[in-house]
Regions:
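A "functional boundary" signal
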Residues: 3-232
Length: 232
């Protein structure tokens, strides 16, 4: 019996380490993180690890650009973390619950979850999650309330610039998001000027896909600036 108990504990330690590695990997290489998660039988996990698994899987799917409109996974995470608001992953869970609701057109619920996520991220000094929340808020409201969208996008970019673990790719994303909001506010020239920084970063990265996305946005900003000049 002792041998079986030790073997069981050792198995769970191994799965726990795999989960921790998968969460870290999900940000930079989500496809590999998903492959790693597929090696774990989540049915045998204790509640805490099952919630961790569900959140990590949902996060990796989102980063991979896969459909995350199904709430079965994030709901498992939410049901656990809602009872453990002091957990370091509570803010991130509330963020992804907000993402789910925004995809389901439940904007009132989405706003509630995102507000809670922002508050908890500030308490926990979780800069990455805070910037994600503000960028999602910006994306949700930008077409109905462009000035508010610009406010959120500007906050996200300003805070992310100071983040010690900021990545060039995410910095580009926040610059372009701010630019899109500026365009919607009739400030296409400012958007075009700001996007030149994104172009420099993308050129330094040597990522053709990212550079193509930057040029596509710059073209849109340039067209808006040209139209504005034609009006005046």
């Amino acid at each position: 019996m002792l041998f079986l108990a030790l073997a069981f504990a050792s198995c769970h330690r191994g799965e726990r380490q795999t989960l921790r590695s998968a969460l870290q990997m999900a940000y930079a290489d989500p496809d590999s993180a998903l492959a790693m998660l597929h090696t774990i039988d989540r049915r045998s996990l204790p509640p805490e690890e099952k919630a961790y698994y569900a959140l990590t899987y949902y996060l990796a799917q989102d980063k991979s650009g896969l459909d995350v409109a199904n709430d079965s996974l994030i709901r498992i995470a939410y049901n656990y973390y809602a009872k453990h608001p002091k957990d370091s992953l509570y803010a991130r869970c509330m963020y992804y619950m907000g993402v789910y609701y925004s995809l389901s057109d439940s904007l009132e619920r989405a706003n509630y979850c995102l507000d809670v996520a922002a508050q908890e991220a500030q308490v926990q000094k979780d800069t990455a999650t805070l910037c994600l929340v503000w960028s999602k808020n910006s994306w949700v409201v930008r077409k109905t309330n462009a000035p508010l969208g610009l406010k959120y996008a500007s906050q996200a970019l300003a805070v992310y610039r100071k983040y010690s673990q900021a990545t060039p790719l995410n910095t580009i994303y926040y610059i372009l998001l701010k630019g899109e909001c500026e365009r919607l506010c009739g400030k296409s020239q400012e958007a075009l000027s700001g996007s030149k920084e994104a172009e420099r970063i993308a050129l330094a990265l040597g990522d053709s896909v990212t550079l193509s996305n930057v040029y596509q946005d710059m073209s849109c900003f340039a067209a808006g600036a040209h139209d504005a000049k034609a009006v005046h």
